[in-house]
Amino acid sequence: RARAAAMNIIPTTTGAAKAISLVIPALKDKMDGLALRVPTATVSLVDLVIDTEKKGLTAEGVNAAFKAAADGPMKGILGYTEEKLVSLDFRGDARSSIVDGLSTLVLGEDMVKILSWYDNEWGYSCRVGDLIDFIASKGL
């Protein structure tokens, strides 16, 4: 796979899926992932497929839940959009992840596919800043 990175999509491994189980132990051995290295400067895209226990899901219902979270308790961390955007539109976005509502799919009654964009440099840096603020607020 050692070819021109600026002209190819390169499948590779990622530790991100396994790292999630360190934060959410209930997900251990329940998820995995891979990465596609693409010739873009900074923005990445999560393609997440979830087999849920809940039946009767709709794309509208899934999107409504993400939108409510993005407008409510996760405001500034999670985003939601129904605009037809591309990777460069998310460059410099401070939110950790922005759900692409136009791409949400429900397969059958219980399988959901979600696409969510993130600026893998700036969004992460903003969360580190949030952590520093939190630690400072506790006097640590």
What are these regions (language model features)?
Residues R1-V112:
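C-terminal substrate-binding/catalytic lobe of Rossmann-fold NAD(P)-dependent oxidoreductases
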Residues R91-L140:
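NAD(P)-dependent Rossmann-like dehydrogenase/reductase catalytic/cofactor-binding core
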